């Protein structure tokens, strides 16, 4: 079958349309049917995506499962995956059934809630499979709408503020990208991504407003794309929308925001910035390194000062994404492999940590750290799961969190030792805020009266965590499951990047060894 990617992209959207048209009423039966249809659809999508993985040939560095149909005005409906994107599709389809299962307690507008998540899944898969600039942009921007609604309708008391802040930040970042895409079409005469990857965008310096633009037109295009992807990651200092969005979003919204939506920024750097604008990427490398290093240290320190559990994990996400941008712009095999691995690992671990917060929020309806303490006495299973993912977040050897951080730091050490040393301090800081959070919430005596009747995790909640624990351990023990898939495509990307660098600057020469 050559249309597998279209099936997994549009199956959730078709299910959402069926749900909207044929599921009537707001009674308990309608809510139950909506949940089961969403769960069955997302599970089927995951199973079909496994066929893509099993039939994928990592040795082929080109795009596979390509679908190409003429659409409108020279724009094509073109889909495909390579070693860089295929695992992000799997991450999305893997997380969705678990997310739906975690929302089983939702009572308010259940049908609409499930529709929003199904549409969001289809749009997220579309981002990772689109091979046309216009198609990519449509998926990339449309994904804002269901998440905006999820936060704005089912979020906390400040949900309207948080949803608009999320929408405006990410949308404004993407306006520049749209302008850059139009410029690229005028230069290259096509919106086909595989063709654009081979197009040599001009990189000769020129004067603009009395200043020399180093990297020429490539730099202007790079900055436009960078604005969009940096907000999406998010990078410091354009990260301030994320803590608000996480705090106000319902648990399932936070899980998908952390596990998948943030990865669109990192994927964008790998798909567009490095291969299409290699000269500009080389010029920007030291600046991106230091922005990432500041993000790791600064947001880790900010995490230590939070009183809300979700805010601690949100700032932790910004710090961990700092390792990703470092690994990507190290532009060597080990760094880029590490960045992809870190994104996948962070998807499992951060998603699980938000689920951990959700478990006790469902019982106590507060995320304030001071409201808890001594939970291990009443919730031993929960305490064990929370401890496991806390350690994985810190980067304990044997978990996927260790592999991602280790590979990215190794890649950065080969390019800039000082930046790598600063980033390494983030490992110590992450242990500080993660263990501090765990100790305050679960350890000690159970003193508060309100906690003395709290119950441990239900079987449904345990089943949600089991696949996440399994993936975190499996990838931690055998990381080649990821690197064997990504390796050849990353090697080709790095080789093209190095060949495009003018007169091989020192950093690039070191990175190629």
UniProtKB/Swiss-Prot annotation:
UniProt keywords, alphabetically: Cell inner membrane, Cell membrane, Membrane, NAD, Quinone, Translocase, Transmembrane, Transmembrane helix, Ubiquinone
GO BP terms in the entry: ATP synthesis coupled electron transport; electron transport coupled proton transport
Record flagged with keyword Cell inner membrane: yes
GO terms for cellular component: plasma membrane
InterPro entries referenced in this protein's UniProt entry, alphabetically: NADH_Q_OxRdtase_chainM/4, NADH_UbQ_OxRdtase, ND/Mrp_TM
Membrane topology, from the record: Multi-pass membrane protein
Reaction it catalyzes: a quinone + NADH + 5 H(+)(in) = a quinol + NAD(+) + 4 H(+)(out)
Subunit structure: NDH-1 is composed of at least 14 different subunits, Nqo1 to Nqo14. The complex has a L-shaped structure, with the hydrophobic arm (subunits Nqo7, Nqo8, Nqo10 to Nqo14) embedded in the inner membrane and the hydrophilic peripheral arm (subunits Nqo1 to Nqo6, Nqo9) protruding into the bacterial cytoplasm. The hydrophilic domain contains all the redox centers.
NCBIfam families to which the protein is assigned, alphabetical: NDH_I_M, PRK05846.1-3, PRK05846.1-5
Record protein name field: NADH-quinone oxidoreductase chain 13
